[in-house]
Amino acid sequence: MALRFPRFSQGLAQDPTTRRIWFGIATAHDFESHDDITEERLYQNIFASHFGQLAIIFLWTSGNLFHVAWQGNFETWVQDPLHVRPIAHAIWDPHFGQPAVEAFTRGGALGPVNIAYSGVYQWWYTIGLRTNEDLYTGALFLLFLSALSLIGGWLHLQPKWKPRVSWFKNAESRLNHHLSGLFGVSSLAWTGHLVHVAIPASRGENVRWNNFLNVLPHPQGLGPLFTGQWNLYAQNPDSSSHLFGTSQGSGTAILTLLGGFHPQTQSLWLTDMAHHHLAIAILFLIAGHMYRTNFGIGHSIKDLLEAHIPPGGRLGRGHKGLYDTINNSIHFQLGLALASLGVITSLVAQHMYSLPAYAFIAQDFTTQAALYTHHQYIAGFIMTGAFAHGAIFFIRDYNPEQNEDNVLARMLDHKEAIISHLSWASLFLGFHTLGLYVHNDVMLAFGTPEKQILIEPIFAQWIQSAHGKTSYGFDVLLSSTSGPAFNAGRSIWLPGWLNAINENSNSLFLTIGPGDFLVHHAIALGLHTTTLILVKGALDARGSKLMPDKKDFGYSFPCDGPGRGGTCDISAWDAFYLAVFWMLNTIGWVTFYWHWKHITLWQGNVSQFNESSTYLMGWLRDYLWLNSSQLINGYNPFGMNSLSVWAWMFLFGHLVWATGFMFLISWRGYWQELIETLAWAHERTPLANLIRWKDKPVALSIVQARLVGLAHFSVGYIFTYAAFLIASTSGKFG
């Protein structure tokens, strides 16, 4: 008999209904649940899939380089980064005739093109690329790496090259190699690239394969390194009148601590960044030699954890048993990795705009907005995933005997206290913040704006002042010119930093007031509620008072019949599902706040944000409605303009989002009945009844329909906001 899909589950393959297809897709990547899976094969499958993932990433980045080199205007943009719009790629078939062709022919192109809002032009320019040939070379190299990754994935599935389980569980060796190799060596290599290629390029010197052995990155070569006079590398930095990409006003320093931004490019000094990466490299190279492997020196992680028993006795046996628990649970490890990566991704969003690393990116407002929003949404999905896998760990991998009275067990023991405290914090934040907003709304509606409750964020202003912002008049730490902190740093990084933090044209430590105070607490409400749902889902994943045997039902189940008084919607999967809505909601508020504050900053009318952000009607009218007007005008009775594609995407995003509700609100019996009726009609309709199917059509399960609804809701939500964000920003600033 021919094998039916899914091959990995023969039980499912014999299912006579369409459930076979959907459940097959849903469990395709759940290797643990597959037939004939062994621990060894599980680890090897995951290892091989990592190579596939790398191949896709390299192929994608190669495609970016290739299309810009082929259809972009990189060489023209390099001549005038502030006034030429960077082109991502051509549009082969612009719909709606001649007006569309004219609307999308821009950036100096001969035909219709898409403008790049990803920041790649600024990035490539900063790291020293200058010509299309450079881009093609990079594309080819990445294509080669992609092929290499695919070969690597295939190779490690061959019997001779398959790693053993013991290799995957050798935590110390893996940590050493990842710290030293992945972070240490790559940071050192990047420092090398910045010093040998990027910094010379910023000073008008082109270093390529044909001359990189002859061009000294520093006039004194390696002399200062070997004689210990490292300070020579910091002497004679680029001047404040330096024109980026030319020798005019340039210096010779390669590793500096200037602080602040390059006046022309509004980005961090390249020599500061080279210094930063060198420091990171040294730290990680040392860190990668700390753990005990073949040589009997260094720390054993197990010994470290076993010794972590807080003396007060309040955490019981502390970290005893954790080493084996974590080392034997892929879900625990994935949860930790996702939690870390989620935080890092959000930090990337925050730092890319406040401390721009790429030349001229700070003046490309649409790109700034797009990159901030992009990284915050990705961070949200990654963080919710961390809790999902944490919950799966508790269901599949947690062993109570191994973890008796340690920190994990004690988390489970006092989960009621954790959940109720989070619940209390969420309720407090929600009612107080909404109360303030609604009060202010009513005052505005009744024509008495002076009766609003406006709270100055004095603690946050004090913290900003401590970092050197002088406009609040606090005179503390770095904003106090007579203090020791101020005097200690005056000769090195401080002048540049203080100039930057008190310069009103950048996004460093923006001035804050009552509107910021309110939206800050709205975002805090979103964060705490999302966390509450996720934490409760993970801590109750094994069982709750209502359903002590929950772990026996697995990660996702709809209900356990009518018998116990309501066991629907309490699986760990349901918690994840609910949390994603809150996560999207929260990031909506975060991005609205960021975008509105920056639009007013860039337009020079910050008072609009300050005055309108203290009540809900202000947000709805002066941010959402006001900024969607250009977008909605992408098509109108008089024709179309270059925003029409975003107008279409805005409508399409709403459609996808609304489709989600069809799956989220409708119930299963209704769909089953509808499907039976449609199937009956199909089988009795001439011509149509020539097409038959083997599987009996059945409605999606409750959990599946929720997943499909959630996917549509999320995708539609993000598409809608992306179109709004890009159109409203590019419509104003080009």
Swiss-Prot record:
PsaA and PsaB bind P700, the primary electron donor of photosystem I (PSI), as well as the electron acceptors A0, A1 and FX. PSI is a plastocyanin-ferredoxin oxidoreductase, converting photonic excitation into a charge separation, which transfers an electron from the donor P700 chlorophyll pair to the spectroscopically characterized acceptors A0, A1, FX, FA and FB in turn. Oxidized P700 is reduced on the lumenal side of the thylakoid membrane by plastocyanin. The keyword Repressor does not apply. GO terms for biological process: photosynthesis. The PsaA/B heterodimer binds the P700 chlorophyll special pair and subsequent electron acceptors. PSI consists of a core antenna complex that captures photons, and an electron transfer chain that converts photonic excitation into a charge separation. The eukaryotic PSI reaction center is composed of at least 11 subunits. The gene is psaB. NCBIfam families: psaB. It comes from Lepidium virginicum (Virginia pepperweed). The keyword Lyase does not apply. It is a multi-pass membrane protein. InterPro entries: PSI_PsaA/B (IPR001280), PSI_PsaA/B_CS (IPR020586), PSI_PsaA/B_sf (IPR036408), PSI_PsaB (IPR006244). Signal peptide: none annotated. This is Photosystem I P700 chlorophyll a apoprotein A2. The chain crosses the membrane at residues 46-69, 135-158, 175-199, 273-291, 330-353, 369-395, 417-439, 517-535, 575-596, 643-665, 707-727. It holds the Pfam family PsaA_PsaB. It is found in: Plastid, Chloroplast thylakoid membrane. Its EC number is 1.97.1.12. Chlorophyll a B3 binds at M662, Y670. Keywords: 4Fe-4S, Chlorophyll, Chloroplast, Chromophore, Electron transport, Iron, Iron-sulfur, Magnesium, Membrane, Metal-binding, Oxidoreductase, Photosynthesis, Photosystem I, Plastid, Thylakoid, Transmembrane, Transmembrane helix, Transport. P700 is a chlorophyll a/chlorophyll a' dimer, A0 is one or more chlorophyll a, A1 is one or both phylloquinones and FX is a shared 4Fe-4S iron-sulfur center. Chlorophyll a B1 binds at H654. Belongs to the PsaA/PsaB family.
